[in-house]
Every structure is written in C-alpha cells, then in structure tokens.
Amino acid sequence: PRHFLTHNKKRYQYLNKIVPLRKCSDHEFLTFVETDNQFYHYPLHVTDLKKMPDKKKIKKELQKRSLLKIKNSKNMEDFWINSIGKTLYNKTINTYNKKMWLVDSTKKIDTFNWSPKGATLKSGPRAAWDKAISCYPKKINGYNDFFDLPKKKNLKILFKTNFKLISLKNKIFEINKVKKKFDIVISTISPDTYFKNKIYGELKFIGRDFHKIVFPSKEIFPKNVYFLYYANNEKFTRLVEYKKFTKHKSKTTLIGMEIPSNNGKYYPLPVKKEIEKSKKYISKFPKWFYSIGRAGTYRYEVDIDDCIEQALKLKDEINNNSFEGAFPIKKWL
C-alpha cells in the first residue's frame, strides 16, 4: 500500500473521481537515533531539539547557519550540514542516506533537494505532509479500480511478455519473438533498456528487499504514525504498518521492512552524471516514442501524481496529434 501525495488539487480531483480517497494528512514519521536512544520526528521538528543530550552544541551550530552557504551547496552532505549543522546531520541524515543509496559518502549525491518532506527543520504541525494533500483509497481493494480502467476500454493487455526493439527508424518491435509495427510507443521502463550495447553505460538504480512480519496485536505503531525510519547501522531503512493506510480490521498487524539492495530497478539515482546519461538515451527516441514514469523519466522525485500529470498531458498530445518528444512535460527535460 502506498498513500497518494500531491500539492496539485487537479491531480487529486482526477484520481478521487475514479478511486474515492480518504484524507490522511495528519500522519507523522518518526526516526530512531541509536546514539540518543530516542525517536525524533522526520523531518526533524524544532521541539525535538529540546530532547537531545547535545542540544547546546546543536544550538551553536544552528546559529552559524548561512543562507548563502545553503544556496551554494554542491552535494547532499554540504547542503544538510549547512542547513542543520554537523551534529544533526550525523544523527539523522548521513548514515541513513548512505545505506539508502548504497554509497560510501553522501557527497556522491549531488542533486540533494529532492526530498518530498520539503523541510530541513520543521516548526508548526508535526505531521510530515501538513502542506500537501495526503490520502489513501477508501475501498478495501485500494487502487484496483484505477488499474482496471483498461478492461472497460477493451484494450489488449499482455502479461509476462518479452518486448524488444528491432528498429526505431522503421517503428518495428518484437513481442514474444513476433515482429510488430506501432505508431506510438509509451514506455515506463529505464530508457537504456532499448539499446543493446548500452552506448552511454547502464543507468544505475537502487532496488529493495522486502520482509513481512506479522505481530499478534491490532496495532504496533503509535497513533498517527505510519512509518518508522532508522538512521543507524541496521540494514533496513524503514518499517511500515500497512493497516494505518488501509484501515483493515484484524486481530493481527502486518509490518513491512525495507532493505536497500541491487534487486530491482525502483529508484533512479539522484546523481547529475546519471541524469545527464539518461537524457542522452532519451534524446535518441523519436517524437512518437514516449518515456515516462519514474523509471522512464529517470527521476527519483517523480511520484504518483507526476505520473498522472505526464499521462494526461500525453493523452492531449496524442489526441491533438501534436507530438513533442519523449517527455510530454518540459520541466523534466
């Protein structure tokens, strides 16, 4: 289960018509910091600072912050140290992001302001998404009604299918070893997939290993807490209690554990070198070939609402026969 997040009312209204949504904007994230033996809010809240054993040192570091230094930061480490100081950075950001992105230094992450949480040190409401629309489908089947729409249009859907590019110039592809010709192709997979020799090098992704744990209790997490993050040396990044989203009634509860790995292509790396590499691949696609979605756009920050926006824009382009290229929205160029 995944909640729907957006700052755009039109995208919310569009999905809400198809899948009635229940608001859950009050939910909070907590991060466990082992050195303090304490849970703090994520993003960090100003009230958390009072609980910290080294709060005096942190206060001095915060007083030395410079807006100019923050603005001119070149990588994730610089950005966060300039924003909250070295002590808070080491408590909550450094180890967490190194294990999340499987890197030995956050200096390697040079697009560093992509966090949807939108704050380095929060004040006001403790809910992580108080300035955005956060919601989840009311029905027990989640988003299924949205994904069932193609059935109503009598579209042909093929599962477990091998899809291979034969010739972009001649619009020829191979499906299960049978050659086919298409007028328009919409791809949501990594753009380097279509190039045999990976001419610019393979695009890097981070995957996830998921472990499910059932507990003999109706709920485990505190009220309004759906996610627990772990900013220490444990292998996993976070735990999720799915019942908080679904409102499922049961005597037991299911917790999901997420461990970063190289299994699967879930998260494009927020690294300029990789993003520029993806643009080179996408520039090879003709105007009738669309590369969209998180993997197709090769942007970690592309969320569900962005995918909907891309799809609706693409629909308009196709209906108006006004193909503009692989990205149907200029901001992702």
Give each language-model segment a name.
Residues P1-L68:
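Dinucleotide-binding Rossmann-like beta1-alpha1 core, especially the glycine-rich loop
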Residues S25-D26, I157-N162, S167, G207, ...:
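Short loop/edge segments at beta-strand edges and connector loops
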Residues T31-V33, Y40-Y42, Y89, K99-T106, ...:
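Short catalytic/ligand-binding loop motif for oxyanion handling, primarily in non-cytosolic enzymes
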Residues Q38, D54-I172, V178-K181:
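Active-site/ligand-binding neighborhood in enzyme catalytic cores
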Residues L44, R238-L333:
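Conserved flavin/dinucleotide-binding core of flavoenzymes
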Residues K164-Y281:
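Mid-domain catalytic core of redox enzymes
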